[in-house]
């Protein structure tokens, strides 16, 4: 019988003498050998051409001296590498938009916290304090048992004290008046007045001061009427051309030479307007605050001067029959003048700077006109009343131009907000809004004689064309280039037959384009400065008047 785990003594002896044999395992290290140079890591490259770092180097290593031992007698800031007094400055090219965004984001940290108005709350504590002050100024609601007399019941209809009756605008003006002592020092008579009377007198003057001048006129002829009792308003019949025809029936050409110069203004001329239909008179407004009317035929002399504005003339507009015209100036007034007698018939004071003015072209509304102001509004007036009839206020910037469409039923306006809006006349809501991120401000707009297109002078040195009816879309096939406006508001217009487009140049050139091909046909060196105003004669084939804002001369071309 076999016993489990049975073994003899001889077998144990053999097992003790045999060696313990184990298999050999060969392991391999696949990582490459890396030399850990601790000293090399502590050394910072100080090469003059080195612009890159392979690791994040501490600041104390970056600013330590390149060579030599450390100086124990200087501070850490003095021992650093600097190319200026305060530190190390490097040249960096940053766009203006990015710089302004970063700079003005920390304006409050540079200039401190702005001063808030008394009526403006900044924190929740200020809101509570403000509401408490309002409650303290609240009048006594009274006794419910008393209906009339002293102590009568007012309830929730009780008013506030005298402090609350002042508007926030008056508070802000009061603070501004207290900080300004220039006028009181110059005026010796104001020192005799009481402080309260002086403040009332200064607060009574509006922030936008309107300058009103006395209207005068000067006739530069011996007499107004001739032997047949005709004034210069009479359309001449002895000039070799019928001036009573409808403009545009003639074939127009580009002028080639300078034939005459009108001189009389002492400063630059801002606008030119030919007499409607006949064009036998030329109206000019200048930076010398004067308006002059010139004779286009015969001796081409100065006929009359209109004086009544305290600031330079901004825009002019003839009425439909030409017997009167509107003028707007930087003195924030709009005046209606009699073309023949030179009298000021009416003055429309809007207390705002008016950039443009335009008479209504609808024959049924000859007494109405529109004015575009710098405070984003278009005002509608009637010459028989100085009050505002209607206001259009959807623009976000100052109004630059007003152009009537579809025989006065609609009109289009352009603004500093780089947008164009189409309106129904009499309705203060735009029917079409044109704006794009690539659009620039378009300060001048002109309607083509056929009434189907408008040309817009853009500040990106191009003239764009839009349809003047139905959907009012841009005609992208027609873009007129080849001139530079340099930010100036330069006149743009059409020849009477619509064949050519003209505009001024910032270099003093008068530019002409072909309407069909959009090709620049001619550049006439007209003036030494920007040609701000140009006017094509409504009856002649190739006569154009030009003026500049740098000289007081009007040049006539043929």
UniProtKB/Swiss-Prot annotation:
Keywords tagged on the record: mRNA processing, mRNA splicing, Nucleus, Repeat, Spliceosome, WD repeat
Recorded superkingdom: Eukaryota
Keyword Ligase applies: no
Comp. bias regions, Low complexity: 162-171
Pfam families for the chain: WD40
Cellular localization per UniProt: Nucleus
Gene3D superfamilies referenced in this protein's UniProt entry, alphabetically: YVTN repeat-like/Quinoprotein amine dehydrogenase (2.130.10.10)
CC per GO annotation: catalytic step 2 spliceosome; nucleus; post-mRNA release spliceosomal complex; Prp19 complex; spliceosomal complex
Record carries keyword Repeat: yes
InterPro entries given in the database record: G-protein_beta_WD-40_rep, PRPF17, WD40/YVTN_repeat-like_dom_sf, WD40_repeat_CS, WD40_repeat_dom_sf, WD40_rpt
Biological process according to GO: mRNA cis splicing, via spliceosome; mRNA splicing, via spliceosome
Record function comment: Functions in the second step of pre-mRNA splicing. Involved in splicing intron which are longer than 200 nucleotides.
Assembly description: Belongs to the 40S cdc5-associated complex (or cwf complex), a spliceosome sub-complex reminiscent of a late-stage spliceosome composed of the U2, U5 and U6 snRNAs and at least brr2, cdc5, cwf2/prp3, cwf3/syf1, cwf4/syf3, cwf5/ecm2, spp42/cwf6, cwf7/spf27, cwf8, cwf9, cwf10, cwf11, cwf12, prp45/cwf13, cwf14, cwf15, cwf16, cwf17, cwf18, cwf19, cwf20, cwf21, cwf22, cwf23, cwf24, cwf25, cwf26, cyp7/cwf27, cwf28, cwf29/ist3, lea1, msl1, prp5/cwf1, prp10, prp12/sap130, prp17, prp22, sap61, sap62, sap114, sap145, slu7, smb1, smd1, smd3, smf1, smg1 and syf2.
Protein's name in the database: Pre-mRNA-processing factor 17
């Amino acid at each position: 019988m076999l016993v489990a785990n049975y073994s003899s003594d001889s077998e144990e002896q053999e097992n003790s003498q045999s060696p313990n044999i184990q298999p050999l395992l060969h392991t391999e290290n696949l990582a490459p050998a890396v030399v850990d140079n601790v000293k090399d890591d502590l050394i910072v490259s100080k090469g003059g051409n080195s612009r890159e770092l392979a690791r994040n180097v501490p600041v104390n290593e970056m600013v330590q001296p390149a060579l030599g031992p450390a100086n124990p007698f200087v501070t850490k800031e003095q021992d650093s590498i600097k190319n200026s007094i305060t530190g190390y400055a490097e040249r960096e090219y940053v766009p203006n938009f990015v710089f302004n965004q970063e700079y003005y984001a920390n304006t409050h940290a540079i200039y401190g916290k702005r001063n808030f108005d008394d009526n403006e709350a900044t924190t929740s504590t200020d809101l509570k304090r403000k509401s408490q002050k309002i409650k303290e100024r609240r009048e006594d609601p009274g006794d419910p048992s008393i209906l009339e007399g002293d102590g009568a019941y007012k309830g929730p209809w009780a008013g506030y004290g005298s402090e609350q009756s002042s508007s926030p605008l008056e508070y802000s003006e009061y603070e501004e008046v207290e900080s300004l002592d220039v006028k009181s020092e110059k005026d010796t008579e104001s020192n005799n007045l009481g402080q309260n009377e002086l403040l009332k007198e200064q607060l009574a003057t509006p922030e936008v001061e309107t300058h009103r001048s006395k209207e005068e006129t000067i006739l530069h002829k011996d007499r107004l009427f001739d032997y047949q009792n005709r004034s210069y308003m009479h359309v001449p019949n002895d000039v070799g051309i019928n001036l009573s025809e409808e403009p545009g029936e003639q074939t127009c050409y580009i002028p080639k030479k300078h034939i005459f110069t009108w001189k009389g203004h002492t400063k630059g001329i801002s606008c030119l307007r030919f007499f409607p239909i006949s064009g036998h008179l030329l109206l000019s407004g200048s930076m010398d605050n004067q308006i002059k009317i010139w004779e286009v035929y015969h001796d081409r002399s100065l006929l009359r001067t209109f004086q009544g504005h305290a600031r330079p003339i901004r825009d002019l507009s003839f009425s439909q029959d030409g017997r009167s015209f509107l003028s707007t100036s930087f003195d924030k007034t709009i005046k209606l003048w009699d073309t023949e007698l030179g009298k000021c018939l009416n003055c429309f004071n809007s207390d705002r700077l008016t950039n443009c003015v335009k008479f209504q072209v609808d024959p049924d509304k000859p007494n109405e006109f529109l004015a575009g102001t710098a405070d984003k509004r278009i005002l509608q007036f009637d010459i028989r009343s100085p009050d505002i009839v209607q206001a259009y206020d959807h623009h976000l910037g100052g109004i630059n131009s007003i152009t009537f469409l579809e025989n006065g039923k609609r009109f289009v306006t352009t603004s500093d907000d780089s947008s164009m809006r189409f309106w129904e006349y009499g309705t203060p809501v735009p029917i079409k809004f044109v704006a794009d991120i690539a659009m620039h401000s378009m300060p001048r707009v002109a309607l083509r004689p056929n009434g189907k297109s408008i040309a817009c002078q853009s500040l990106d040195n191009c003239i764009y064309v839009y349809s003047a009816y139905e959907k009012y879309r841009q005609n992208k096939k027609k873009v007129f280039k080849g001139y530079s406006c340099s930010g100036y508001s330069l006149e743009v217009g059409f020849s009477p037959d619509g064949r050519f487009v003209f505009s001024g140049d910032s270099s003093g050139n008068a530019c002409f384009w072909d309407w069909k091909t959009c090709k620049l046909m001619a550049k006439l060196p007209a003036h030494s400065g920007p040609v701000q105003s140009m006017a094509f004669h409504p009856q002649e084939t190739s006569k154009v008047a030009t003026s500049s804002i740098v000289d007081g001369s009007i040049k006539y071309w043929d």
